[in-house]
């Protein structure tokens, strides 16, 4: 149907003097019986039969204006049900011109006519009719309700959309729409979704983000399954530097499985990293990389490894770091893999990956790679000291690592010199003992 029970405000104003009311009328027995048959046919989804019954009634010479108005109004309803709004409009205008209904019914009819103008894209006529209805409703003591204000706001937004962007005319229509959109949302017990949308669009048109936030918060509460409202609210919070609130909304979206795209899932994982919850970030990245919703790319596997490393889960960082390293064109990630094995004190694996990193090349700091290789070999034990020394000496060839590398060279050479001195001293002692033995034989 056309009509809404929120066309009028719930609390009616004290009535001004209305037009002279017509006596309450009823149909004659014969006309009423046929009229009921037409209604029953409509109820049985037989609109053509209903229309024929009504047409036959209109052929009667003894119809009173009230009966004629009711019959034509029901015919208009038949056309509206068939979505033939042009015809429905013609018939309702005929009823309105008869002026045979009660004043309240005439007022309702005027609103329906305004709605049908809009349904047939006759925006100017609909606007004019609605303004007349507003005036008549106020005069009769029936202040317009939320749905009427929402409709008028929508008309002004339509007019705004037909003007040049950023023009004075566009702004003027938004100004006209605002009080009506505000009344629709704030005066209704349960505002409709599109009323919120209209009011929100007006506030966002002027970048009035502070005012838009409570509206979006209400929309999220009223329509908890609408992803777009959460997304807009998170964006508004971020715009207003309310990053914690923005993150909270995105957490809710994730818990509701509203984040499905690569960028969305990556962003929430990065937010968990930013808020120092790396374990949660790693779980998201791991799950979504395996599902394919986060792309199988080097940087994403590296990010997963970083998350595990930040969570101090060294072993869990190794598989994604290997994947990322294998996809990489340089040796940088193999070097990081070697460092991860160093954290685990797995010196054998650490040495292998650092060597491979140096071999693959294109490192940001090759001198540091040689230094780490030296440390790893040194940790493997005394028999790897010479190869460690070789690595440290290679590291001294890089200016930024020279001082550190020389310290390591000095440490190892000192240890070796000390051992050599100890060896010589031990040999000398043995020789001395051998010489002394002649006196005891």
Question: Which residues does each PLM region occupy?
Answer:
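N-terminal leader/linker segments that initiate helical-solenoid repeat arrays
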Residues: 1-93, 100-108, 119, 128, ...
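Solenoid-like repeat scaffolds
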Residues: 20-26, 58-64, 96-102, 132-141, ...
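Generic helix N-cap/helix-start motif at coil->alpha-helix transitions
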Residues: 27-36, 65-72, 102-112, 141-152, ...
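Residue at a conserved register position within TPR or TPR-like alpha-solenoid repeats
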Residues: 41, 79, 117, 156, ...
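Structural motif corresponding to the intra-repeat A-B loop/turn of tetratricopeptide repeats
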Residues: 44, 82, 120, 159-160, ...
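TPR/TPR-like (Sel1-like) alpha-helical repeat modules
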Residues: 173-179, 221-222, 238, 254-258, ...
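Alpha-helical adaptor scaffolds
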Residues: 298-312, 319-368
